[in-house]
């Protein structure tokens, strides 16, 4: 398997990014980008049985996959000049609710965009009633080519 084309971070079209993730974990889970802008990414996921835990409620990893994917693509699309990539150095997710059907959506926003780190906050909501079900935050270390 080959890595994605390194120029993909320049393309902010949600459809192009959805095609890119199709063969990777976010695509298999069903993550869909709805918008990609400076410092902001939105996405959604239609809940299916494989997103649920054995207790019938949405599995925590489903929420993290949606939130982390949107934050990660936000970081990638907002890297400083000269950066070659990023890696996650911290993430946390506070669950405030759950869902068993319908869809969930999120808004990822950059709260810090420095030369060496970025911090992204993500609110995950149920689409049906707009209830916030999770607050996610991740810190990304910005990577540069070795001299």
What label would you give each PLM region?
Residues 1-147:
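Terminal targeting signals and extreme-terminal segments of soluble enzymes
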